[in-house]
Amino acid sequence: MINKAILGGTFDPIHNAHINVAYEALERFNLEEVIFIPAGNPPHKIKLKKTPAHIRYEMVKLAIEKETRFSISDFEIKSKGLSYTYRTLKHFKEKEPETNWYFITGEDCLSYLEHWKYIDEIFNICNFVIFSREGFKEKEEIIKKKKSILLKYGKEILFMDASILDISSTKIRNRIKEGKEVSFYMPDKVYKFILQNNLYK
């Protein structure tokens, strides 16, 4: 069976940590492909100001262009309404029903995971992978959440210690506003694109 993963995010901007997570997942889960999906209108970020979708899409495209096992989808940014994870996963599962799908997201999602729309269906569609920037310690809250989800949905959440730098898109945007150097946080073409388009000033 073919294994593929979906890595969704606002990618505002995409940075080296996103890329490293994708590479880590390729090896860990024997993936044929990681599909980057720039978020359209995520329900938990409705009020947050975002860079236009076509610009975020272009930055992701530039960041991954040299890796044949990475691809990009405009499914969410072209879809109308709120960008629910369930709708995205359902789309790809219907497109490739024989594929074994993984969905990769950050540790911060754990706290409200059970409140996601159609979370029970999401668990039926894919393997849920949580990654941490700092590496997973057996924190009490994580152990409780793992047990809770296993009991409620009969599904095991997969955890991935991603060897990544302490980088966030928010940190990058703030550093640019402050006139600080950010080139080492992202692929060179993304950095040049940000400069050329005067983003995040």
Curated annotation (Swiss-Prot):
Catalyzes the reversible adenylation of nicotinate mononucleotide (NaMN) to nicotinic acid adenine dinucleotide (NaAD). GO terms for molecular function: ATP binding; nicotinate-nucleotide adenylyltransferase activity. GO terms for biological process: NAD biosynthetic process. Pathway: Cofactor biosynthesis; NAD(+) biosynthesis; deamido-NAD(+) from nicotinate D-ribonucleotide: step 1/1. It comes from Clostridium botulinum (strain Kyoto / Type A2). Belongs to the NadD family. It is an enzyme of class 2 (transferase). It comes from the Bacteria. The gene is nadD. This is Probable nicotinate-nucleotide adenylyltransferase. HAMAP family: NaMN_adenylyltr. It catalyses: nicotinate beta-D-ribonucleotide + ATP + H(+) = deamido-NAD(+) + diphosphate. It holds the Pfam family CTP_transf_like. Its EC number is 2.7.7.18. The keyword Nucleotide-binding applies. Keywords: ATP-binding, NAD, Nucleotide-binding, Nucleotidyltransferase, Pyridine nucleotide biosynthesis, Transferase.
